[in-house]
Structure formats: C-alpha cells, structure tokens
Amino acid sequence: MKNLDWGSLSFGYMKTDYNVRCYYRDGKWGEIEVCSDEYLKLHMAATCLHYGQEAFEGLKAYRCKDGKVRVFRMEENAARLQSTCRGIMMPEVSTELFCEMVKKVVRLNQEWIPTYESGATLYIRPLLIGTSAQVGVHPAKEYCFLIFVTPVGPYFKGGFSSNPYVIIRDYDRSAPLGTGKYKVGGNYAASLFANNLAHEKGYACEFYLDAKEKKYMDECGAANFFGIKDNTYVTPKSTSILPSITNKSLMQVAEDLGMKVERRPIPEEELDTFEEAGACGTAAVISPISYIDDLDTGKRYSFGEKPGPMSKKLFDTLRGIQYGEIEDKHGWTTVVIE
C-alpha cells in the first residue's frame, strides 16, 4: 500500500499506476488494454470534442474492516451508461465488459485503495468518448471506453455535516426532454456558472427548479434531492433528473427501515413541511441540507443545523452495506479483492 496520509485526502485527482481501455472499431469492441499513460491521443475533429459525444460514470471501491475490497452496485452503473449510450447514439458497453474492466482496474491499482480507518475511498471513473474525426453533427464510427481510478477523501470537507443551498432560477441544468437523465458532460458544463454563483454567495451548492414551470424541486447541483417527513422519504420525479444509484439505494434502505417512499413532483412550498432534507450521490453519499434560501422571495426553508436522525440512520445503513458491516441482503456489493 502506498505511504499516503489517507485521512487528509481531498476529493480530487491523483495519478495512480494504471488505467484500462477498450476500443470500438469496425462495429465491435476489441480486447481490454492496460495502460500506464494518463493521456489520450485524440484526433482534433473527434466527436467528443466538438459535439459532446461523451458519457461517464462514477462509483467507488471500499477497503473494508474484514480486509476485503468491495465495489458497490457496478451493474447499475453499467445499466445507466447503456441508457446514456442509447440517448446520444453511442455503442453500448455490455455489463460483462463494464464489470470486467472495473474489477481489473481496481486490482491493478490496489496499492492506491485507502485504508479502512481513513474514511477515504477509491473513486472509479468510467469514460466513453467518440474518437473518430467528424465535421458535421453525426455519431462517431469509433469510440474509446476507459476507466481510471483515484483515491479520494470526502466530497465535502466537513464530512457528514449539514450545508446550506440556494435556489437558482436564472439557470437550468437541463431541459425537460433534454439530456438531464443521461450522465453526459454537457449537463455539468451547464451547471458550472450557477454553481460558481452559489459558492460566491456562501452556499455549498445551487438548487435547480424544474425548467418548464419553475415550480418544482429538481436537482441540487450534481446530486438528487430528498426530503423526510412523517416517516416518509420523498424524492422528485422528473424527466430532467439523473437517476441516481445512491438515491435508488436509499429508497430501498428507507423501505427496509420501515419508512414509506414517495417519488413524485415536489412543489417548492412543500419544503416548509420537511423535517429533514438532503442531497445524495456517489461522491458524498448523503449531504444533509441545513437550509435552502430562495433569494427571489426572501424565503428560507430550514431543516436544522445538524443532520437529522433519519438522514443519519440512512447514511449509516448504506455505508454499513458498502463496507460489508451490515448484511447486504439485496446483493449490491461485489468483492473484487479477497
């Protein structure tokens, strides 16, 4: 294992030893290649550079208390990538190929997997890009699918603590029938200005309303939203929201804990009724929300300065499953290193 101060890692890129790649040419995927080079050689007219033909995923490997290394729900990431491929006209990466490459890259870089005690993890980033030259808006004929890994600390520096959010009305992350449900870079580019605006105003993240009516809660930055009231886990239903694997898992955990689950449109005024609220995603798992400000109306929706009891219970349960400390009765984790 590398001699690093695992406990002080930030959520950022660090070079590791290997990445894995697979190329799509002549209508089929080739063999998996192992590479130590951090760089890609790309044609200047590649479709990923001009027409946004790229998709990515994010998942994690955990070094657990029992010494094993587990990966969480990688088949779900494969399925979501396949959905994105269909949406932006790229060849699908089979679940078998996806999972084989995930396991291979984790094993190749096992010295970079943080210690159990540190709270840090190995972040896994699959990336699919159109590589063939194209002038004119058409799908590429050739593609590169690669996966790299990097050890990361908590996404938010304070760890599991509450953060303030702000509703941004002047910007939309995605259109109602656009690419919001796909994990493509363009959605994140569309969020950069609003995210910077939120940070300048002292908030952890921006909160988007639905692009069509500006009435319903959509996404919080790059994460899904949930609210808790009356022992019910409520999360938005929208065609412009990325289907979060973490949120999907939390909905199941909530049911396992005896909570009701509702996935439906959430009007802004309903925020007043929630006892707890949070953002969820692979990076932070759960980021509890202390309050949401609506600067246009002057309204503040408060959920408490500290994480609520149900948010903490959901977080602890899901983390326990990821780390192999709580029974994985849904078969979500895969042991990749014994």
PLM regions with names:
Residues 1-105, 127, 134-338:
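Helix-start/capping segments and mature chain N-termini
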Residues 97, 105-119:
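Charged, gly/pro-rich active-site loop segments
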Residues 115-129:
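Extended, Lys/Arg-enriched charged tracts that mediate electrostatic binding to polyanionic substrates
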